[in-house]
Amino acid sequence: MNQYDLNLILNPNISAEQVQTEKDYIENAVRNAGAEISNLDDLGNRRLAYQVGKDREGYYLMYTIKASGNPETAIASSLRLRDNVRRVLVVKDRPEWKTKKA
């Protein structure tokens, strides 16, 4: 099984109920792609490095998922159709990127 990082930026003006609805949809999309969620980091509203549409802020969600095969396109394409999703990035996680060699 490969490990992937799924990073999302949502509309910063959504309510807590809408955030929960989006999280449920994301979990279903990940499961439908044959993957499982191993970790979720809910970072909340943060300032963006550059303006996306009319927004200078975004609601950040960072998932760590495990899957066999290549679920990137299936997950990203289904999530990009959501109105509250501003950006989607699915990256294959590699352990050597997280450790610094001396």
Swiss-Prot record:
Native source species: Deinococcus radiodurans (strain ATCC 13939 / DSM 20539 / JCM 16871 / CCUG 27074 / LMG 4051 / NBRC 15346 / NCIMB 9279 / VKM B-1422 / R1)
GO cellular component entries: cytoplasm; ribonucleoprotein complex; ribosome
Biological role: Binds together with bS18 to 16S ribosomal RNA.
Pfam assignment, any one: Ribosomal_S6
UniProt protein name: Small ribosomal subunit protein bS6
Keywords from the named record: Ribonucleoprotein, Ribosomal protein, RNA-binding, rRNA-binding
PANTHER family given in the database record: MITOCHONDRIAL 28S RIBOSOMAL PROTEIN S6, SMALL RIBOSOMAL SUBUNIT PROTEIN BS6M
GO terms of molecular function: small ribosomal subunit rRNA binding; structural constituent of ribosome
Family label: Belongs to the bacterial ribosomal protein bS6 family.
Domain of life per record: Bacteria
Record field: transmembrane: none
GO annotation terms (biological process): translation
